Amino acid sequence: METLCSIILAAGEGTRMKSCRPKVLAEVLFKPMIQHVLDSITKAGIKDTCVITGYQHSILEAYLKENDPNVKTVRQIQRLGTAHAVSMAIDFLKKHLHADVFIIGGDTPFIDDDTIRKSYEHHISSQNSATVISAEVENPFGYGRIVRNPNNKVNAIVEQKDATDSIQKIKEINSGAYWFKVEDLIKALPKIKPENAQNEYYLPDAIKVFINEGNIVDAYKTTNSDVILGANDCLQLNALNEIARQKVLRNLMLSGVNIPCTDGVIISNDATFGQDVCIMPGTIIRGNAAIKS
């Protein structure tokens, strides 16, 4: 996957967080959400990444310089939507003209390297111009629905407000993460129109352009439905932390770590444990700590 690249959208203010810091730096298990995304992209084997910064850009750029110095940044001065954000990285894209690009929001901490790899394999084997990562959920309200044609290819992504009663019953939703052939994406970006109440340029409309021009568009349905999850306020951030906390504790207990009561136990997913370790209530372990037997 050496020839691949990725773009992380991280320009948004996240007003409901009521923070003076970029939303993507809000932490899930002691690690900024964008760092979870970067770690998964790196584990998947993607070596060249560009982060689109915007709100409080200097704070995010300083964090990236210290923690991921190889990551490139481009600033979106006017925040006019996700497709507009991607267009800010046009020079980055042109350097990867004959490659594929993975595009994702920086506030989706549960994206995992397995989903990235498998969606790329599907993207290549199906010879797609664009591949949407989708997930099937019990409550799809608020998400764009994946509408497929009789050949099971993506026919449209329909937003909640535009969905008919029959489309609203569809449980397969758009995660907001995509693979694109770079050359095709560069051609599509200027054709996206701000045909919405916000007068903004949205990346899902690139899918509409691709479909209208006869390019192959498909969706890779992940079994990890948590990849869709993000946080727009501190209540949702708390929910993400609890999901992540429970996953870590479950994996530790299945690996032999004794946690007789999980009350107040918060452990970083980078921590490691020796054999026969017992963790008592109220224990907090941060970072890549190593607890020996």
Give residue spans per PLM region.
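Catalytic metal- and UDP-sugar-binding loop of GT-A-like glycosyltransferases, i.e.
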Residues: 9, 28, 104
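Conserved core of the sugar-phosphate nucleotidyltransferase
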Residues: 111-197
